[in-house]
Amino acid sequence: MKSFITLATLLVASAVAAPSHNVKPRELYNDDAPHADDPNFIGAVMRAHWFWRRLHCAQDLVWDQGLADAARRDISECTYMPEHMRSGSNLSSQKPAPSKYEDWIEFARTASHGWHEEETKYPYDHPHYEDAWGHFTQMVWRNTSRIGCAVGYCNPEQVDWPGRFYCYYDYAGNNIATGQFEAQVWGPVCSDPSVGEAIKRSEIDYDWSRK
């Protein structure tokens, strides 16, 4: 992975532009977190998935606003603890919740990259599901093609872990049927993405809804 350091620098250092959305009411503690259609938020999530999926020979994902809206609705329920509401989901939470817009973007970025860190636990010689690596396997599941995510701030006086980040995937990964993990979770054996590709995807107006 000769270009890993250069690519990682690009992925981390991409500028965060000022939020462009209009503030809209929703059923959460406040509205400081970026909305699910925010380009900075989408870019932070998608660059992480794009990079790691390329290394694991998985197809590029496209952003699905319907999945993102579903993730936002489920976060808005503000269950006491974060809960998987459906198959094909990855969740992260933070306490205390991020305090400003830029911190929410960083939360989404670091959580997305953090899911890949579970790869060190994954037994390639005995592929199967366990919670210890379930975020990683969903992230790189090869026939998953679409993703939508959201963040939200639940009332810290009513819930634990009020800062929440949910991603929903289609097709859902972590299928425990015989042979699925062997077929869908490959090691990091494919070539690094090029620096040029990373630069293109660092642009704020990059269209993640298309391959």
Set out the residue ranges of the language-model regions:
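Fungal secretory targeting signals
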Residues: 1-24
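Fungal extracellular Ser/Thr-rich, low-complexity intrinsically disordered regions
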Residues: 17-35, 194, 199-211
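Short, well-ordered surface patches within globular domains
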Residues: 33-89
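Active-site rim elements
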Residues: 36-38, 57-58, 99-102, 127, ...
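Solvent-exposed loop/turn segments at secondary-structure junctions
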Residues: 51-53, 68, 77-78, 96-98, ...
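A solvent-exposed, acidic/Ser-Thr-rich amphipathic alpha-helical stretch
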Residues: 85-111
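Disulfide-stabilized extracellular recognition modules
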Residues: 108-211
